[in-house]
Amino acid sequence: MPIGVPKVPYRIPGDEEATWVDLYNVMYRERTLFLGQEIRCEITNHITGLMVYLSIEDGNSDIFLFINSPGGWLISGMAIFDTMQTVTPDIYTICLGIAASMASFILLGGEPTKRIAFPHARIMLHQPASAYYRARTPEFLLEVEELHKVREMITRVYALRTGKPFWVVSEDMERDVFMSADEAKAYGLVDIVGDEMIDEHCDTDPVWFPEMFKDW
């Protein structure tokens, strides 16, 4: 049984023959990124660095970010979101599996009209939580104040990008709200449900793949 990252044949432009390289390296060359774990500093630096590099390499071609994550650290998630708004290319966000907590915030940060959820994906939003609830009282009060500011900022972003009133989003974030792909589309978190893309192309293409994969 193979262990580690799968290798696939890939011909680097200019080379005569294909070489075996890590699957993820091929996907990066094709401007396809994956967020498939809890959001922490390391994966945040990895994804934001790739976004900046791909933007410098080609500022016109879209970047695809696949998301299957339970969420994670607030500041790390906000760093990815802000990078998505800063780089020149449009960024597709595609949810498969689950996009919970800060992962749903990143899903929301994709280019409007280019936010996609697979038919059986689950999306969850809730209010930010603090890891310092056992701190001494003065530290705890400072943490609560900062958390309140961050919560308001995140709520405003959700309201702005979904078109929902601020108070509606704020009330929804008081608890864990799980949504299906269709419910997330109705809420404004995504623009397209994956099976809609299949229906759109099945009349003309028996098997449809994104443009970047057609030469494979």
Swiss-Prot record:
It catalyses: Hydrolysis of proteins to small peptides in the presence of ATP and magnesium. alpha-casein is the usual test substrate. In the absence of ATP, only oligopeptides shorter than five residues are hydrolyzed (such as succinyl-Leu-Tyr-|-NHMec, and Leu-Tyr-Leu-|-Tyr-Trp, in which cleavage of the -Tyr-|-Leu- and -Tyr-|-Trp bonds also occurs). GO terms for molecular function: ATP-dependent peptidase activity; ATPase binding; serine-type endopeptidase activity. Keywords: Chloroplast, Hydrolase, Plastid, Protease, Serine protease. GO terms for biological process: protein quality control for misfolded or incompletely synthesized proteins. InterPro entries: ClpP (IPR001907), ClpP/crotonase-like_dom_sf (IPR029045), ClpP/TepA (IPR023562), ClpP_His_AS (IPR033135), ClpP_Ser_AS (IPR018215). Its main location: plastid. PROSITE patterns: CLP_PROTEASE_HIS, CLP_PROTEASE_SER. Pfam families: CLP_protease. Gene3D superfamilies: 2-enoyl-CoA Hydratase, Chain A, domain 1 (3.90.226.10). Cleaves peptides in various proteins in a process that requires ATP hydrolysis. Has a chymotrypsin-like activity. Plays a major role in the degradation of misfolded proteins. This is ATP-dependent Clp protease proteolytic subunit. It comes from Sorghum bicolor (Sorghum).
